[in-house]
């Protein structure tokens, strides 16, 4: 303000640029400049929608467009759904963005589809759950700004163009209109199609990694998943953001979310290796490192998870936990706990990981020191361990006989039960009590080791091993059921 008149304005972006001007100094890379915002590249992908999507998904998209026309709003499919459509990769996670009242649109679409609608009015978002369990996300077109680097965003309603502008990479800024008069029209404001063809990950503006440093982790994930590469300029900005300590300001739970997504990918080690190159792992915690044999360990985990998946057994394993146990497995307890404190996962996850790591380390020592591995011993060691820790152990152990013993436990031994039950022991005249547990466990171990096979074998085993708790007749023999009834009637 000068002389009572407004001469200009300083925006949030101006302040961030001034604060982080060193980070934003652009290296002189040829042909690496960013494209200017402009009108979208014209293209219609209705035929691609028809050829690539199941009829049911096409019907849902058509219904969304029809409802949009009825309530007077423009409706778009956006994000990874559109990106993967153009890449000819299957992705049925439908995300819709509405220019207007997204909640009102979601409720109207929910009525048409007989879907349950869960709304979050603060953010202008909703989740539609169809009767068969299929889900669609609906969001009001919005823009975001960040009060400070690495902060959570503040949200305001906006246009589809500004909604796409807030996204991480140009390949995720593509949108397809679903309204009847424009069905299949592809919006590409930021050159996302060209970047898909060039296999390049490009940020939309220079402050992208300042606003949200977790985008660096997503960049590595997308690089490996799609075989893409960060543009040289974007890579330099990512490394600058790491060196300036911006990741240290990110809430741990957000890092946990990104790490979980990474460990659920097909090639998690390659992503971690890329993050290590960018300095991200050390920025999260100095002890978060990749040992010389970690790649081989991750490869074995992948093989073990594939093997277990082919068994079609319940329960299923949380694969990312198995990889996390492997990543932390060689650390001391205090070190892994320190990293978990930085990541700050939900308490249930933190407790599980700490417990599983302790069990994994103890089991590894036991198996390494064991000279013999009878099935009963393996059962006693593993029966109380989580599935994830057992699979991590199987991948960790190199001795074939140990891996086979663990595999036998998972495939058959853990389901073994003795034939006799408590009522059978009672029929033998054994008084109910803690002794039942001892007897049944002994029977189980004997069956696991092949010492008993039939019901008669188990009866003989009990009479021989637990003779002291069996009632005896006056001749020193075991009492029959008739003898016990007679004695009871005499009493």
Regions found by a protein language model. Name each.
Residues 1-491:
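Catalytic cores of the polymerase beta-like nucleotidyltransferase superfamily
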């Amino acid at each position: 303000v000068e002389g009572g008149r407004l001469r200009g304005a300083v925006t949030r972006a101006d302040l961030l640029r001034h604060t982080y001007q060193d980070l934003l100094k652009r290296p002189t890379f040829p042909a690496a400049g960013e494209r200017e915002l402009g009108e979208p590249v014209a293209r219609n992908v209705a035929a691609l929608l028809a050829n690539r999507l199941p009829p049911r998904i096409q019907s849902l998209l058509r219904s969304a467009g029809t409802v949009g026309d009825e309530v007077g709003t423009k409706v778009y499919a956006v994000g990874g759904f559109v990106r993967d459509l153009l890449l000819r990769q299957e992705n049925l996670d439908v995300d819709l963005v509405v220019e207007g009242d997204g909640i009102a649109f979601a409720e109207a679409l929910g009525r048409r589809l007989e879907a349950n609608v869960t709304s979050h009015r603060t953010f202008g978002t909703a989740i539609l759950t169809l009767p068969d369990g299929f889900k669609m996300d609906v969001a009001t077109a919005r823009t975001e700004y960040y009060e400070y680097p690495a902060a959570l965003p503040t949200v305001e309603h906006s246009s589809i163009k500004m909604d796409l502008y807030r996204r991480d990479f140009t390949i995720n800024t593509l949108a397809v209109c679903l309204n009847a008069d424009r069905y299949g029209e592809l919006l590409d404001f930021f050159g996302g199609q060209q970047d898909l063809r060039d296999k390049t990950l490009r940020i939309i503006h220079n402050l992208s990694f300042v606003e949200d440093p977790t985008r660096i982790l997503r960049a590595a994930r997308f690089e490996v998943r799609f075989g893409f590469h960060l543009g040289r300029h974007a890579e330099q900005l990512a490394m600058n953001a790491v060196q300036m300590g911006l990741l240290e300001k990110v809430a741990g739970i957000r890092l946990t979310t990104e790490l979980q997504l990474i460990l659920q990918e097909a090639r998690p080690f390659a992503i971690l290796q890329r993050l290590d190159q960018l300095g991200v792992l050390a920025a999260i915690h100095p002890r978060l490192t990749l040992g010389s044999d970690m790649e081989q360990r991750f490869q074995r985990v992948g093989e073990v998870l594939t093997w277990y998946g082919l068994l079609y057994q319940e329960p299923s394993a949380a694969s990312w936990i198995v990889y996390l146990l492997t990543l932390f497995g060689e650390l001391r307890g205090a070190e892994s706990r320190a990293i978990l404190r930085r990541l700050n996962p939900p308490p249930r996850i933190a407790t599980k990981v700490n417990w599983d790591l302790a069990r994994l380390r103890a089991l590894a020592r036991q198996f390494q020191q064991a000279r013999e591995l009878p099935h009963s011993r393996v059962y006693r060691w593993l029966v109380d361990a989580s599935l994830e820790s057992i699979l991590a152990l199987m991948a960790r152990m190199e001795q074939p006989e140990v891996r086979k013993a663990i595999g036998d436990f998972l495939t058959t031994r853990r389901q073994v039960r003795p034939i006799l039950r408590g009522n059978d022991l009672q029929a033998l005249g054994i008084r109910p009590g803690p002794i039942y547990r001892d007897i049944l466990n002994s029977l189980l171990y004997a069956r696991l080791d092949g010492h008993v096979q039939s019901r008669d074998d188990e009866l003989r085993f009990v009479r021989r091993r637990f003779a002291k708790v069996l009632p005896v007749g006056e001749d020193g023999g075991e009492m029959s059921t008739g003898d016990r009834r007679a004695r009871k009637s005499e009493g």
